[in-house]
Amino acid sequence: TAQGFHFNNATMKPIVNNAGWKKAFELYKETGKYGPPEELNLDIGDTRALFKAGRCGLLVEWGDPGPLQLDDDATAIKGKLYAISALGSREVLNRATGELVPVNNVNAPHAIDGINYAPFAAFGGWAGAVNKGADQKTKDAAYAFLSYMNQSAQSSVDVTIGATGYNPYRLSQLSSPDLFVKAGMPQALAENYIGAINGALNSLNMASDMKIPGAQKYTSVVLDTELALS
């Protein structure tokens, strides 16, 4: 993350037209050979329905699929999951040349056994805000609601329900699989699920989603333009 994942930190030019991006698109295109014919038109709800029906051998997602397999309509996959934080690579991008080079201790100091892992914190998490123009009673009510939703008593239930979109985020939720075992996960799966999330969060090489003013414009306008010209 410190290196700048989305763009050159000095020039703000998107890092897209290089061998790393080309390889990523090639791999992404390759996965299409193994998906359903309508894959390009599927949204998140569609893919999760296929997942719960037992039609997915591999799903790249947030942490939601873990508790989603507890749903009544997910009997085809209940207890049959295995989670990992992210796949890695034996090559990394040389930013000076734009080419891929083999992993070594210098260009990938956090690599493990010659493989560089870079879990991506996609989306970046939920946030709540209170309108400063609201009257005080409304502000107090909004604050009380946000506080209630985030306190351990409520959030520790919500993270075990896939439909909430909440994933474990409090230390108490990440330190033990007990919440998920209580919700119905097999012990081994609960340990695997929490372990995968912790593996990503604790990675020294985690790539954070963009958190700058105007990020939406950058990703939907500037980046799209660069990709079209690449």
Short names for language-model regions:
Residues 1-10, 25-29, 117-131, 217-229:
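Periplasmic solute-binding protein
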Residues 2-41, 82-89, 101-109:
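Glycine-centered hinge/linker elements that transmit conformational signals in sensory
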Residues 33, 74-172, 207:
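Extracytoplasmic/periplasmic substrate-recognition and gating elements
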Residues 38-53:
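Short helix-initiation/N-cap motifs at beta->coil->alpha
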Residues 44, 61-66, 85-87, 124:
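Beta->alpha turn/N-cap motifs
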Residues 52-62, 79:
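Alpha-to-beta junction loops
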Residues 61-77:
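A ligand-binding cleft/hinge motif common to bilobed small-molecule-binding domains
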Residues 97-113, 160-228:
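Long, aromatic- and glycine/proline-rich binding clefts that accommodate carbohydrate-like moieties
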